[in-house]
Amino acid sequence: MDVFKQSEVWFVIGSQNLYGPKTLQQVMDNAHQVVNSLNNEAGLPVKLVLKPLVTTPDEITALCREANYDTACIGIMTWLHTFSPAKMWIGGLSILNKPLLQFHTQFNAQIPWKTMDMDFMNLNQTAHGGREFGFIGARMRQQHSVITGHWQDKEAHQRIGQWMRVAAAKQESQQLKVARFGDNMREVAVTEGDKVAAQIQFGYSVNAYGIGDLVAVVDAVSKGDIDTLVEEYEATYRFTDAVKLNGDKRENLLDAARIELGMTRFLEQGGFKAFTTNFENLYGLKQLPGLAVQRLMQQGYGFGGEGDWKTAALLRILKVMGTGLKGGTSFMEDYTYNFQPGNDLVVGSHMLEVCPSIAKEEKPLLDVQHLGIGGKADPARLIFSTPAGPALNASLIDMGNRFRLLVNVVDTVEQPHPLPKLPVARAIWQAQPSLATAAEAWIIAGGAHHTVFSQAVGVDELRLYAEMHGIEFLLIDNDTTLPAFKNEIRWNEVYYQLNR
């Protein structure tokens, strides 16, 4: 999944004409060097494009208007090399609808103590030029990010890269289409929500399709295409005897391949990058899509079970954020606990649908086994465990007057014992700060039982994503205490009531 290749971030230098052509030319010469260095040496996921110097209100407004309509531009990164009076930026910033990053840097890393004169001081004015720019952002109540550090500093590079990933995720959010096969699982509350409010807030559209629409595409898949896909399965996974050629569940595997091909074509034809299924709405399908969903998630699609469109959209957004990073991202559900002093654990899984991007095994096991829910034939699925390491669980919930993004930092552990009778993929983790505190805080905050589990994306990216969209962000980690967490929820309730 290469979502960054066609994207760019515009690097914009603000100044004013009173400095004269010689100084302004030096500013642009320095900017060229900074941009070339960042593009070639910083490992940024998105290309920086240096734009012409802006020195007047009209130039700034024209540039912001152009950025809004350029589909390749996912955001603007500003540098106040000199002093740029911020009233000049009001018109442009008031219409800008792309993410904005202020890079508070300067060309020189250290002060040239022996040679510094007033010419040097006038040229290198980030220290106060950046504050002027920051004031107008604060005065306009406009969300914008600030990163401070020298342009050759690796920590600054990392933070710029994080911002770029989130800016790309916001762009994806604004054009994302989510398909719901069937409706919500009956009587379930948290998977419901205001789809119109979500489209206004995030940009993505959510629409439902009858299972018959999908079945028609599935039934049209040819035997030749099925055989080709099964050959891919055989090269990619370990097979149990039941699904090998002449195995007693071989036909179930062929049916699963047919469903995958049909779902893929339906999603591609409709331009969908996320989808949901529901085991209560399977009319016309021979089995619950398990293998198909797992493989589609690995290809970058978002997914939510039981009609959970919010989790499906969030999963796709995290897939975009985590592109090219180590670790995977998957649909997940807190399934069962291990209550043991000093070793409290959570087993995360789902009926079938866990993404192989988080698999520890190089070749997951492909099997067909009974599923006692849904009333259909035994479904195919990939079975694997998850490697140890840092991770998080994220949940997007509709609170009525706002959306809340809830995140719990967890530590994934190696599976402590074999699970010979558990025929599904799983992850096992220790919740921060403890299972008791994490679970109580999650429940108090109304967190869903479905989550997005990621070993690729971190807390900083998700906090920034929430800031870019103006939604609530709550974090449960090693610093969390329940009294403080409850107070934060109370304060947030007041803020969002007043900030309608």
Curated annotation (Swiss-Prot):
Q: Which family does it belong to?
A: Belongs to the arabinose isomerase family.
Keywords in UniProt for this one? Arabinose catabolism, Carbohydrate metabolism, Isomerase, Manganese, Metal-binding
Q: Which residues form a coiled coil?
A: none
Q: Does the keyword Isomerase apply?
A: yes
Q: What class of enzyme is it?
A: isomerase
Assembly, in brief, is:
Homohexamer.
Please name the InterPro entries in this protein's record: Ara_Isoase_C, AraA_central, AraA_N, AraA_N_sf, Fuc/Ara_isomerase_C, Fucose_isomerase_N/cen_sf, Lara_isomerase
Q: Which GO terms describe its molecular function?
A: L-arabinose isomerase activity; manganese ion binding
Q: State the Pfam families in the record.
A: AraA_central, AraA_N, Arabinose_Iso_C
Cofactor(s) the protein needs: Mn(2+)
Q: What is this protein called?
A: L-arabinose isomerase
Q: Which gene encodes it?
A: araA
The catalytic activity of this protein is classed by the Enzyme Commission as 5.3.1.4
Checking CDD domains in the record gives: L-arabinose_isomerase
Matches recorded under SUPFAM superfamilies = FucI/AraA C-terminal domain-like, FucI/AraA N-terminal and middle domains
Q: Does the keyword Metal-binding apply?
A: yes
Which reaction is this enzyme known to catalyze?
beta-L-arabinopyranose = L-ribulose
According to UniProt, this protein's pathway is:
Carbohydrate degradation; L-arabinose degradation via L-ribulose; D-xylulose 5-phosphate from L-arabinose (bacterial route): step 1/3
Q: How is the cofactor bound?
A: Binds 1 Mn(2+) ion per subunit.
Gene Ontology terms: cellular component: cytosol
Sorted alphabetically, the Gene Ontology BP terms of this entry are: L-arabinose catabolic process to xylulose 5-phosphate
Q: According to the UniProt entry, where is the signal peptide?
A: none
